[in-house]
């Protein structure tokens, strides 16, 4: 009985603490642009807030636009950190953040070359909260894509600096 009471007490305290820190679930679209390089990234994201900071994780799908030189597609995941500049209680504030994106892109052509990519990204943006539960977050970032595997795409366009505009939207709990 004592263990059950202790379990219920700890569970109640943990749920109460989590209820004080909002979290968000939504979709995200990013469009990395670099010298000779264009890409599309769509994905799902989860973000948890603690006062003026937030931590996010996401799963992404990478695909090349129709007008790109070489075709590719692949999956990735990321983890990120954001810090808010404002203290607006409505949740609409500017932010600055860092994100680490790991992606496995499969380049198409005569042979399929699987490429593991690592991209550190710095971003700035604005987090808008509509009503109590809906959000949208436009942002722009700069990242440098680093290829971990040795194979290269035919024009070496898979490495280098990227300007990364993005937009996410979803539901706040």
Language-model-detected regions and their locations in the chain:
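Extracytoplasmic loops and strand-loop junctions of Gram-negative outer membrane beta-barrel proteins
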Residues: 26-29, 106-108, 150-152
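A short acidic/glycine-rich loop-to-helix N-cap element
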Residues: 147-158
